């Protein structure tokens, strides 16, 4: 063996050892803020993590989104989000709500997803009671005036036009429509245009009555907040919220979301680039291998021409895409739901490169399932740990994390548990999960743009179990 070879082998061994050590001492994570949870008599769960400071975030997280709609009222959850800020008897106009929040230096935000809705505020600690009062008022006493509903239609229609102009939004909506055909997850969050134009006050109120029940509400807070005081405030302000007569589990059991391998393409030769996604059925929130698939997502990575690293990036697929000039960008996504999920790649490329790009993506899936190594697994575990543990920093992120995890898992994951579960992932775990989910499967495929060169579906499916030469 030459001296150069000996030096290379020695360097490789040192490199391997550097990743085999624990680079983070997790003991400090055991002293993270305690999550206190109290369940009220009407089913509302109040959860807090108290830290020192002057600021607190408090929010209401609702186990209700577009998945609980029908074809007839699809879009009502999102419409409700818009209307919730339009006035109550106590705060009769949108301006009165905004002024009150601004006068106490706070902020109010909301979102609607396929499974959840959320309304949350960030305020100084002395204003937490005011925040609870505002949230309880808008969620229970909104007037939903017909004139304001008519005005808001135009706003939502404009929002829909904007979304339809964003290729990534269109691709992911089409991906859901293809993967979950004829099911609740296949619908869009905004709903079809005809529904936006026709949703009524009665439909909005009915949706609240059916879905905004105590057993489906989590009120979470983080930062400078006292748990016992918040519990008393919620007891008072949300006393009129009732338990559901039909449990959420019974309602959800009636909703089927079977994954269907399929394709949905929209050809538009006037567009300069192809936007596409290829995805497989993934894991739900509660699956024990959740963090393994998160790690696989990290390993496959993301890339775009604007990143500073250029071609010098850690991701194997990213290096190939950059070196061979295959794409303008690509990303890896893992979207979780209660009983299923989507995992895959989204890509943007020139029409003549799409065949090679799709092939390399699926080749990378197979490589991870069969021959990924310890060094890349350990390196990406550190990256995943960093991005995941950052979600435990900052009152807004912590408040959101508490609400989401209690809705999806029924409990709060501590930073120490997250660290332990990620740190214990092995190469064998990665290969096992990748082999199960990413090999020899029928994917869902969507593409828009000049797609004449997009590979035939049978080729895409075939590339999940054999490599193109």
Curated annotation (Swiss-Prot):
Its EC number is 3.4.24.64. InterPro entries: Metalloenz_LuxS/M16 (IPR011249), MPP/UQCRC_Complex (IPR050361), Pept_M16_N (IPR011765), Pept_M16_Zn_BS (IPR001431), Peptidase_M16_C (IPR007863). Gene3D superfamilies: Metalloenzyme, LuxS/M16 peptidase-like. PROSITE patterns: INSULINASE. Its cofactor is Zn(2+). Transmembrane segments: none annotated. Induction: Antisense RNA inhibition of the mppB gene induces gene expression of nuclear-encoded mitochondrial proteins (mppA and cxdA) and surprisingly also of the mppB gene itself. These results suggest that antisense RNA inhibition of mppB induces gene expression of mitochondrial proteins, presumably in a retrograde signaling manner. Up-regulated by Pseudomonas aeruginosa, PAO1 strain and PA14 strain infection. It is found in: Mitochondrion inner membrane; Mitochondrion matrix. Zn(2+) binds at residues 78, 82, 159. GO terms for biological process: mitochondria-nucleus signaling pathway; protein processing involved in protein targeting to mitochondrion. Keywords: Hydrolase, Membrane, Metal-binding, Metalloprotease, Mitochondrion, Mitochondrion inner membrane, Oxidoreductase, Protease, Zinc. Binds 1 zinc ion per subunit. The keyword Cytoplasm does not apply. The active site is at 81 (proton acceptor). It catalyses: Release of N-terminal transit peptides from precursor proteins imported into the mitochondrion, typically with Arg in position P2. GO terms for molecular function: metal ion binding; metalloendopeptidase activity; oxidoreductase activity. Binding to alpha subunit is required for catalytic activity. Heterodimer of alpha and beta subunits, forming the mitochondrial processing protease (MPP) in which subunit alpha is involved in substrate recognition and binding and subunit beta is the catalytic subunit. mppB is probably also part of the cytochrome bc1 complex as a core I protein in the mitochondrial inner membrane. Belongs to the peptidase M16 family. Catalytic subunit of the essential mitochondrial processing protease (MPP), which cleaves the mitochondrial sequence off newly imported precursors proteins. Preferentially, cleaves after an arginine at position P2. Plays an essential role in mitochondrial biogenesis. This is Mitochondrial-processing peptidase subunit beta. It comes from Dictyostelium discoideum (Social amoeba).
């Amino acid at each position: 063996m030459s001296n150069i070879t000996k030096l290379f082998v020695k360097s490789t061994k040192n490199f391997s050892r550097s990743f085999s050590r624990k680079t983070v001492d997790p003991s400090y994570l055991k002293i993270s803020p305690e999550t206190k949870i109290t369940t009220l008599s009407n089913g509302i769960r109040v959860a807090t993590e108290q830290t020192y400071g002057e600021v607190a975030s408090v929010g209401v997280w609702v186990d209700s989104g577009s998945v609980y709609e029908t074809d007839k009222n699809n879009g009502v959850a999102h419409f409700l989000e818009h209307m919730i800020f339009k006035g109550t008897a106590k705060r009769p106009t949108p301006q009165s709500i905004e002024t009150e929040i601004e006068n106490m230096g706070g902020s109010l935000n909301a979102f609607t997803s396929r499974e959840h809705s959320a309304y949350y505020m960030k305020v100084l600690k002395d204003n937490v009671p005011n925040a609870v009062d505002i949230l309880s008022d808008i969620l229970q006493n909104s007037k939903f005036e017909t004139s304001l509903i008519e005005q808001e239609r135009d706003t939502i229609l404009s929002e829909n036009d904007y979304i339809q102009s964003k290729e990534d939004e269109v691709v992911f909506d089409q991906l859901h429509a293809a993967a979950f055909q004829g099911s609740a997850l296949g619908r869009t969050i905004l709903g079809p245009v005809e529904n936006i134009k026709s949703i009524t006050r009665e439909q909005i109120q009915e949706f609240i009555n059916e879905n905004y029940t105590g057993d489906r509400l989590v009120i979470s807070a983080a930062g400078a907040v006292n748990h016992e005081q918040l519990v008393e405030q919620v007891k008072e302000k949300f006393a009129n919220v009732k338990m559901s007569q039909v449990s959420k589990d019974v309602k959800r059991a009636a909703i089927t979301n079977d994954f269907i391998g399929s394709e949905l393409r929209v050809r538009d030769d006037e567009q300069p680039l192809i936007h596409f996604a290829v995805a497989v059925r993934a894991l739900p929130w509660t699956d024990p291998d959740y963090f393994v698939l998160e790690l696989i997502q990290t390993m496959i990575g993301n890339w775009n021409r604007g990143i500073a690293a250029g071609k010098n990036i850690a991701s194997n697929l990213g290096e190939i895409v950059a070196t061979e000039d295959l794409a303008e960008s690509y990303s890896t996504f893992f979207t979780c739901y209660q009983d299923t999920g989507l995992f895959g790649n989204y890509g943007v490329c020139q029409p003549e490169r799409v065949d090679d790009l799709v092939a390399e993506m699926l080749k990378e899936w197979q490589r991870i399932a069969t021959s990924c190594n310890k060094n890349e697994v350990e390196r990406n575990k550190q990256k995943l740990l960093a991005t995941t543990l950052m979600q435990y920093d900052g009152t807004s992120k912590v408040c959101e994390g508490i609400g989401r995890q209690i809705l999806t898992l029924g409990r709060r994951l501590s930073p120490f548990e997250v660290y332990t579960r990620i740190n214990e992932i092995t190469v064998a775990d990665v290969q096992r999960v990748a082999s199960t989910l990413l090999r020899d499967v029928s994917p869902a495929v969507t593409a828009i743009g000049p797609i004449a060169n997009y590979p035939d579906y049978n080729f895409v499916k075939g590339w999940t179990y054999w490599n193109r030469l």
